[in-house]
C-alpha cells in the first residue's frame, strides 16, 4: 500500500506520480518515502504499457528535501562511518536508477524543490517548473554544514559547468524559475496550470531517456580541468566571496 504517492496511468501510457505525504505541509524525503518511490519506479520499468512518467506534488511545494528527524536518527556518534554510508546511499542509488532505467522521467515542479527535492528533479530527464515566485530550486544544505548527498554536487556541474555551479553549491542560495531556465537547470517555465501538459507533451514527442553525461562524447560545459589555473582561481575566488558574505561564519 502506498502512503506517500499515488500512481495513475492514462490512456496514452503516461504515468503520473504524485507525492502527497499525509499529515505534512510539505513533502520530505526519508527511508519510507524512498522505498515507496523505488517500488513505483520498478513497476514503471517492468510495465511495457507505460512509456514514460511525470513526477509532481499534490502540495503547494514540490519536495523540501530530507526529513531532518530521519537524518538525525540515521546519523550519530553511535554509528560507524560504514553504517552512516549504508543509511544514506539509498537516495543516490534510487536517483541513479531513475536516470538509467531506460524510460523517460519528467519533473513537473509546481513549487519549491530544495536539497534532495532538487536532486530528484536533476535525476529526471526533463524538468518543467511553474512560472510562480514560490517555485524555485536549490541545494541549501551547505548553510547548515551539510553536503547534498543525492548527487546534486555531481549533476549540477555536469549540466551547467563548474564555474556557474560553484556560487550555488558554496552559498546554497535559491534559484528562481527564470534564472534556473537561463542557467540550463530546467528546460521550460510554464504557467502553473500547464505543468503536467508540458511534461506530457515532451514525453509524447521523442524523449531522450539518457542523461547528457551518459551519452557518448559528452563533455562537462566549460571543461573539467579541475587542476587548471583558471579553475583553481575560480575556486579561490568563490571561497573568498563566500567568506566575505558570511563574515567568516561559513559552516
Residue ranges: model-predicted function:
Residues 153-163:
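Hydrophobic, secondary-structure "cap" segments at the distal end of domains
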Residues 1-56, 82, 93-96:
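Conserved CoA-thioester-binding segment of acyl-CoA-metabolizing enzymes
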Residues 57-94, 113, 143-145:
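Glycine- (often His-adjacent) and acidic-residue-rich active-site loop
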